[in-house]
Amino acid sequence: MNKSRREALHSASSYIEKALDIVNDARYDEQDCIDNTPENLQSSERYEAMESAVDNLEEAADSLKEALHYIEKAVE
């Protein structure tokens, strides 16, 4: 792989790392809301939506980590 492509992929990795930080921040904030939800509201539709959001954000974070891994392997 030539230098120009490697540099472009390093740049892409930086953007993905920033995206990963944003996704993780949102996931941690949403999980904090779940953890602080009163017990009487834990059966609510909103609570279930928050749990689903956390699960989806966790999947997104895993996918971003996987993308970083494959980019790193490609640049080697």
Predicted regions: what is each one?
Residues 1-76:
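Long, low-complexity or tandemly repetitive, helically biased scaffold regions used
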